[in-house]
C-alpha cells in the first residue's frame, strides 16, 4: 500500500540522547505549525518521523526494525502504510543507503530538519526526498516559536564536536562545534518560561564549549538566564572535562538557580585507554577537576559515561575504571559496551574485545555504579529539599518530581504540575525517593 498523499496526522519517535529529544519536540512543532495533528502512536499516524541515534550499532539496527514493523502493522490493519521520514544521526551517516535499503519517503539530517515540511510535501508528490546538508545551525531561525512545554524543558545552545574521540561518530553526524547566538538563546528561554517551564536544561554535544564573540562563556549565559523571572532551575549537559572553565565551576557556588548536578563523562579510568580514545585528559586531571567542583559546591551530584571493552583494554586497565568509580562516588551514570562505528579510527584498531568479555565487564561496572547510586540516594534520607512536580503518579493523590540532584521523588500532595514543594525524604530506593511535603514553595 502506498503512503498517504497528503498526511494529516504525524508521530515523532526519538531515539538516543537528550539532544534528540529536543530535536524531536521541534520537529513536532514544525508539523503542527503546518496544520497537522499529533497522533496517539506511530501505528495511527499518516506520517511517522523516526528521529535516530547512530552512537551504537544496536540503535541503528532498531531503526530498520521499526520501519519493517510499521509497514507490517499497516498491512495487518488494512490501512495505507504511513509516510516514513528518517531523521537524526542515522540519516546523516547513511543518507541514500537508507532510501536504497528501506525505501523510506524522507531522509533528513539533524542540521536540516527545519526543511521537513518541504521534504514531506515533495514525498507526497511521489518522489523520495533527502536533505543531509549541514549549514551552521541555520535551522533555529526557521523553527516556530515555543508555545507549549512541560515544567522541565530542553534548550539546545551548542551543537557539534571538535574533539574527535576515536570511537565517536558525532563529529561526522553533527558537524563542528557551533554555538547559538546569546540573544536567540535568551529569547527562547523566555518563551519556554512563558509557556510554562520552571526548569531549563541547556543542551550541547559539548555544552560547556558554548561561547560567543564577547567571550561570555557558558557561565555568563547561565548568569543571564538566572535573571529570567519565573525560571526556577537551570541545568546543562553534556560537558567535556577540557572545557570546564573556572567561571563555570564558580557558577555552581554563585548561581542559586543552577542545580547541584554535573554530568561529566570520563569513559575510562586508565591513562593508556584514555589516550587511545583521544580523550585529551588523564585520570588524574579528571579527578582533580572534580575536586575543584566539589570545593565550591560540596553537595553536588556527579554523573558520568563509561565505555567498557575499548579495543585492547586489558583486565588491569579495566580495573582502573572500577577504582575510579570507587574514588568518585557517582550519583548515577550511563555505561555501555564499546560498539565499533564505521569510519571511526577505533573500528580499525587491533585488539577488538570479545562480546563475552565486554558483557562480563559491563556487569561488574554496573554493579559498582548501582552500589554508588543506592548509597547516594540513602544519604538523602532525612534531608529536606525542593522538588519540582512534573507529573501525576500511579496512585490517587500521588505526584512525581525531581530533586535538585536529579533524583525521582514521589509524594502524596495536592500540589500541581509545575509547583515547587519542600519535601523531607523519608524513603530511599535504588532508583527513586519518597518524600513528605513540608512546605509548598512559590508556585
Positions of the model-derived regions?
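Terminal RNA-binding accessory module
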Residues: 348-443
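Conserved, mostly hydrophobic/aromatic
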Residues: 185, 202, 236, 264, ...
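Conserved SAM/AdoMet-binding glycine-rich loop
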Residues: 81-85, 93, 194-315
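Proteins enriched for Cys/Gly/acidic motifs involved in redox and nucleic-acid/cofactor modification
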Residues: 1-210, 247, 262, 284-295, ...
Amino acid at each position: 500500500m502506498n503512503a498517504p498523499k497528503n498526511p494529516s496526522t504525524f508521530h515523532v519517535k526519538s531515539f538516543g540522547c537528550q539532544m534528540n529529544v529536543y530535536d524531536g519536540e521541534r520537529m513536532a512543532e514544525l508539523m503542527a505549525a503546518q496544520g497537522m495533528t499529533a497522533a496517539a502512536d506511530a501505528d495511527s499516524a499518516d506520517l511517522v518521523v523516526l528521529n535516530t541515534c547512530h552512537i551504537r550499532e544496536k540503535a541503528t539496527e532498531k531503526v530498520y526494525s521499526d520501519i519493517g514493523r510499521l509497514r507490517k502493522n499497516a498491512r495487518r490493519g488494512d490501512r495505507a502504510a504511513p509516510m516514513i521520514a528518517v531523521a537524526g544521526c542515522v540519516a546523516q551517516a547513511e543518507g541514500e543507503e537508507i532510501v536504497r535499503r528501506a525505501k523510506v519517503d524522507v531522509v533528513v539530517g539533524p542540521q536540516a530538519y527545519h526543511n521537513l515540511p518541504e521534504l514531506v510535501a515533495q514525498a507526497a508528490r511521489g518522489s523520495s526526498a533527502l536533505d543531509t546538508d549541514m549549514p551552521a545551525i541555520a535551522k533555529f531561525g526557521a523553527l516556530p516559536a515555543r508555545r507549549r512545554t512541560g515544567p522541565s524543558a530542553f534548550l539546545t545552545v551548542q551543537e557539534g564536536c571538535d574533539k574527535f574521540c576515536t570511537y565517536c561518530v558525532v563529529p561526522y553526524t553533527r558537524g563542528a562545534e557551533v554555538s547559538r547566538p546569546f540573544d536567540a538563546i535568551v529569547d527562547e528561554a523566555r518563551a519556554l518560561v512563558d509557556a510554562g517551564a520552571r526548569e531549563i536544561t541547556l543542551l550541547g554535544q559539548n555544552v560547556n564549549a558554548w561561547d560567543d564573540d564577547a567571550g561570555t562563556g557558558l557561565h555568563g549565559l547561565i548568569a543571564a538566564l538566572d535573571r529570567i523571572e519565573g525560571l526556577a532551575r537551570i541545568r546543562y549537559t553534556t560537558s567535556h572535562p577540557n572545557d570546564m572553565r573556572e567561571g563555570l565551576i564558580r557558577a555552581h557556588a554563585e548561581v542559586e538557580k543552577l542545580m547541584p548536578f554535573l554530568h561529566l563523562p570520563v569513559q575510562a579510568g586508565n591513562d593508556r585507554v584514555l589516550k587511545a580514545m583521544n580523550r585529551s585528559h588523564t585520570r588524574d586531571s579528571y579527578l582533580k577537576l572534580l575536586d575543584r567542583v566539589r570545593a565550591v559546591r560540596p553537595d553536588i551530584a556527579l554523573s558520568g559515561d563509561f565505555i567498557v571493552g575499548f579495543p585492547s583494554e586489558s583486565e588491569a586497565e579495566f580495573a582502573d575504571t572500577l577504582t575510579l568509580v570507587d574514588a568518585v562516588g557517582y550519583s548515577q551514570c550511563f555505561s555501555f559496551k564499546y560498539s565499533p562505528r564505521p569510519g571511526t579510527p577505533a573500528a580499525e584498531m587491533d585488539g577488538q574485545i570479545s562480546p563475552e568479555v565486554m558483557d562480563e565487564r559491563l556487569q561488574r561496572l554496573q554493579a559498582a555504579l548501582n552500589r554508588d547510586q543506592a548509597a547516594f540516594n540513602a544519604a538523602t534520607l532525612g534531608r529536606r529539599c525542593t522538588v519540582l512536580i512534573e507529573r501525576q503518579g500511579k496512585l490517587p493523590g500521588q505526584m512525581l518530581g525531581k530533586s535538585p540532584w536529579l533524583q525521582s521523588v514521589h509524594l502524596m500532595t495536592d500540589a500541581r504540575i509545575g509547583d515547587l514543594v519542600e519535601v523531607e525524604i523519608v524513603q530511599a530506593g535504588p532508583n527513586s525517593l519518597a518524600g513528605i511535603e513540608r512546605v509548598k514553595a512559590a508556585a
